[in-house]
């Protein structure tokens, strides 16, 4: 009876331990066979934070250009566009400022 329980536990523990080692190796390795950096996945939150801070800095700029909050034409995401590339004041006027 005890040997059956021991075999069942070993059959359960070994795959879990192997999976745990594989996961730890991914996190701790500096690069994989394709040259990708696994640690870069951890920095994705930083890119999101940078995007969010860019969007927050963009709000006062839009207010200074339009005199009001952005009212994007055609559903354009102004923060996505202007945080990935530089946007001119003319571009912001074109897509954000309400038509007179």
Swiss-Prot record:
- Provide GO CC annotations from the record: extracellular region
Tell me a GO biological process for this protein.
dauer larval development
Entry-linked Pfam families: Ins_beta
Supply the alphabetized keyword list.
Disulfide bond, Secreted, Signal
PROSITE patterns (alphabetical)? INSULIN
Which Gene3D superfamilies does the record cross-reference, listed alphabetically?
Answer: Insulin-like
InterPro entries for this protein = Insulin-like_regulatory (IPR052335), Insulin-like_sf (IPR036438), Insulin_CS (IPR022353), Nem_insulin-like_b-type (IPR003235)
Instruction: List the signal peptide residues.
Output: 1-18
Disulfide bond residue pairs: 54-83, 66-96, 70-97, 82-87
| Similarity remark | Belongs to the insulin family.
Please report the name of this protein according to its UniProt entry.
Answer: Putative insulin-like peptide beta-type 6
Q: Which organism is it from?
A: Caenorhabditis elegans
The uppermost taxa in this organism's lineage are: Eukaryota, Metazoa, Ecdysozoa, Nematoda, Chromadorea
